[in-house]
Amino acid sequence: MTRILDNDLIGDEGSVERTLRPQYLREYIGQDRVKDQLMIFIEAAKRREESLDHVLLFGSPGLGKTTMAFVIANELGVHLKQTSGPAIEKAGDLVAILNDLEPGDVLFIDEIHRMPMAVEEILYSAMEDFYIDIMIGAGDTSRSVHLELPPFTLIGATTRAGMLSNPLRARFGITGHMEYYQTADLTEIVERTADIFDMTIKHEAAYELARRSRGTPRIANRLLKRVRDYAQIMGDGMITTQITDKALTMLDVDQEGLDYVDQKILRTMIEVYQGGPVGLGTLSVNIAEERDTVEDMYEPYLIQKGFIMRTRTGRVVTEKAYQHLGYPYEKTIKT
């Protein structure tokens, strides 16, 4: 069953996000620290008539990395060519993409951490000095061909910055950490989406929905669609706080934005492991989820909300989690 609070795209959400996508930094809601930096760097590059330094955007799924890449290209007034790490299977794929770039273009590589190493190594000289050397032919007839490239800006997006090699990471002159959104910013995003799709929503309802959306615009917009459905069938179409609460409760999204999987993780840690510490691998097996899924999809929000802590000996449930789930808290828990 598809998880309503999944950070990744579901169904036709890609086309929906393109409809909602802001075009320029002034329209982009949230991520003020990243925006303020980019505004300066982009304007400086334009005044010097140079390509922008390469940009690395990292953070959890659904926080606007792809949107930011398109905004950067629009601000620069250049074309954006988009691909992804898994799609570039061999060196020839990357060479073809690079050879098709025009001066000043933006090349956006999503999930850049998933590129094969042989492909990644070609990027080094392309990023640093705008050229690539490739081997043509095989055996005794093989020869090296030197290709000059036009100046371009590479924007890499990743949910796992730690998996990037040091040589690749060092070639990004600009890094932007896309953080979870504040409730006020998410509220504005919810109201903007409602306006675009001609929904009627009370400000208090938008705030309540934003508060329970895990700091993630993608999740907020997804929940808004389901709340709209509920309001249409169970009410008069107006999205109120009461309607929002009832709809989210029906969807198993609690007051802290946790769903049944989040609660299962916390309850397992409390009931089976006495609050921890417990290793990530052991916990993943117990709840029948992949280790990477737990680490990338569930754990970041639980840590950000203060429900679990990482320690040297494993994950530990906090007093806040005990209180939220209604368990008595024992202060003798080891950390």
Curated annotation (Swiss-Prot):
Residues 182-252 are annotated as: Small ATPAse domain (RuvB-S). Pfam families: AAA_lid_4, RuvB_C, RuvB_N. The keyword Cell inner membrane does not apply. Residues 255-335 are annotated as: Head domain (RuvB-H). InterPro entries: AAA+_ATPase, AAA_lid_4, DNA_helicase_Holl-junc_RuvB, P-loop_NTPase, RuvB-like_N, RuvB_C, WH-like_DNA-bd_sf, WH_DNA-bd_sf. Residues 1-181 are annotated as: Large ATPase domain (RuvB-L). ATP binds at residues 20-21, 62, 65-67, 128-130, 171, 181, 218. It is found in: Cytoplasm. One of its GO terms (biological process) is DNA repair. Coiled coil: none annotated. Mg(2+) binds at residue 66. It catalyses: ATP + H2O = ADP + phosphate + H(+). One of its GO terms (molecular function) is four-way junction DNA binding. Its main location: cytoplasm. DNA binds at residues 291, 310, 312, 315. GO terms for cellular component: cytoplasm; Holliday junction resolvase complex. PANTHER family: HOLLIDAY JUNCTION BRANCH MIGRATION COMPLEX SUBUNIT RUVB, PTHR42848. Homohexamer. Forms an RuvA(8)-RuvB(12)-Holliday junction (HJ) complex. HJ DNA is sandwiched between 2 RuvA tetramers; dsDNA enters through RuvA and exits via RuvB. An RuvB hexamer assembles on each DNA strand where it exits the tetramer. Each RuvB hexamer is contacted by two RuvA subunits (via domain III) on 2 adjacent RuvB subunits; this complex drives branch migration. In the full resolvosome a probable DNA-RuvA(4)-RuvB(12)-RuvC(2) complex forms which resolves the HJ. NCBIfam families: PRK00080.1, ruvB. Has 3 domains, the large (RuvB-L) and small ATPase (RuvB-S) domains and the C-terminal head (RuvB-H) domain. The head domain binds DNA, while the ATPase domains jointly bind ATP, ADP or are empty depending on the state of the subunit in the translocation cycle. During a single DNA translocation step the structure of each domain remains the same, but their relative positions change. Belongs to the RuvB family. This is Holliday junction branch migration complex subunit RuvB. It comes from Streptococcus equi subsp. equi (strain 4047). The gene is ruvB.
